């Protein structure tokens, strides 16, 4: 599934080295410390998760959980969008399934979007100096 590969690449492109350390820390129970040192890129992290059955194209709940507890709503939103668009699992459906651990992920969708014209606060120009 090409969309899955694209999702992982997009996520990898948005994960810095600092982010990676935080993500590895968030799932330290699932990554032995000696393996953690070998994981030095986002793609290596995703590969590790796939090889340990924590991630696949039809089950993204683990990384949704990690992105939420790591306070990365931008990454979480990318995963939720993929799940809704590609897997055709709506936010209502997810409440009835075990495909996600964190059904509250939908709360982040509004954070990422751009405000409408009505929502933009227009400031008055600064006062003129006399």
Curated annotation (Swiss-Prot):
Changing residue 71 to A: Reduces MAPK1 binding. This is Astrocytic phosphoprotein PEA-15. Coiled coil: none annotated. One of its GO terms (cellular component) is cytosol. Its main location: cytoplasm. Pfam families: DED (PF01335). It is found in: Cytoplasm. Residues 3-81 form the DED domain. Keywords: Apoptosis, Cytoplasm, Phosphoprotein, Sugar transport, Transport. The keyword Transport applies. Phosphorylated by protein kinase C and calcium-calmodulin-dependent protein kinase. These phosphorylation events are modulated by neurotransmitters or hormones. InterPro entries: DEATH-like_dom_sf, DED_dom, PEA15_DED. It comes from Cricetulus griseus (Chinese hamster).
């Amino acid at each position: 599934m090409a969309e899955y590969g694209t999702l992982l690449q997009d996520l990898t492109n948005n994960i810095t080295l600092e982010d990676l350390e935080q993500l590895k820390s968030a799932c330290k129970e699932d990554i032995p410390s000696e393996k953690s040192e070998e994981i030095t890129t986002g793609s290596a992290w995703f590969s590790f998760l796939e090889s340990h059955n924590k991630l696949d194209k039809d089950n993204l709940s683990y990384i949704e959980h990690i992105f939420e507890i790591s306070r990365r709503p931008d990454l979480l939103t990318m995963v939720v969008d993929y799940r809704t668009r590609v897997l055709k699992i709506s936010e209502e459906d997810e409440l009835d399934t075990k495909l996600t651990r964190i059904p509250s992920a939908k709360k982040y969708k509004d954070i990422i979007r751009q405000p409408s014209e009505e929502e933009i606060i227009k400031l008055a120009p600064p006062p003129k100096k006399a």
